[in-house]
């Protein structure tokens, strides 16, 4: 946050008149000019920016080492992202392309109804964890698509798939203050976890509760061994 500065407001016609009436080297006054000072000081902003945890969501990271590496990499590419009021955050542009040259490993992922090895497999765990955090922070969801299968690392209805040239996850900061994304990959008790925290400024004590309901169960018709 940069310090604020006072400004002076005046009309060009007043300035032109004073300039034309002044002698060479003379200092003139603009009697109708007004001094405008900032409504909020830098010190006041420092006290309210990112001072509250709007939400936090944690998922357990499992699978092959390549998958865990991909989750850790995507987390590192979204952490620290700041959305000003009214701005949106798109997940895809921050983490793609899913290529070896961009640091990604081959790992299992969903593709056209099947689980296959692909470069960047597991990248959707970060988008899903971020989506859940955005939901619990009551932020506006602009784009979100679920996986074709339920994901074992997150609850029903809380996943968000992202694919290069395909589904995207995007949400908007619909609060009046900036929001910072903090993504942390850590190990505890020999297990890996991803925690996404959204920091901002709370203006009330409201909170979000999410409830899922099974509307229909479709029995399988093919048994895959």
Task: List where the protein language model places each region.
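Well-ordered beta-sheet/strand-loop patches within structured domains
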Residues: 1-225
């Amino acid at each position: 946050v940069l310090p604020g500065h006072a400004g002076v407001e005046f009309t060009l016609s007043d300035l032109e008149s004073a300039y034309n009436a002044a002698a060479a080297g003379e200092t003139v006054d603009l009697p109708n000019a007004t001094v405008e000072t900032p409504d909020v000081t830098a010190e006041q902003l420092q006290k309210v920016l990112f001072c509250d945890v709007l939400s936090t969501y944690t998922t357990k990271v499992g699978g092959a080492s390549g998958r865990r590496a991909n989750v850790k990499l995507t987390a590192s590419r979204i952490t620290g992202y700041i959305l000003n009021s009214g701005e949106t955050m798109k997940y895809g542009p921050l983490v793609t392309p899913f290529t070896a040259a961009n640091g990604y490993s081959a790992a299992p992922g969903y593709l056209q109804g099947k689980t296959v090895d692909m470069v960047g497999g597991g990248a959707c765990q970060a988008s899903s964890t971020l989506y859940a955090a955005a939901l619990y922070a009551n932020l506006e969801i602009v784009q979100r698509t679920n996986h074709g299968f339920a994901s074992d690392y997150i609850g029903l209805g809380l996943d968000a798939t992202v694919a290069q040239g395909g589904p995207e996850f995007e949400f908007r900061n619909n609060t009046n203050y900036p929001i910072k994304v903090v993504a942390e990959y850590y190990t505890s008790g020999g297990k890996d976890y991803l925690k996404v925290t959204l920091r901002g400024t709370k203006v009330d004590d409201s909170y979000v509760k999410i409830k899922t309901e099974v509307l229909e169960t479709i029995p399988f018709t093919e048994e895959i061994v």
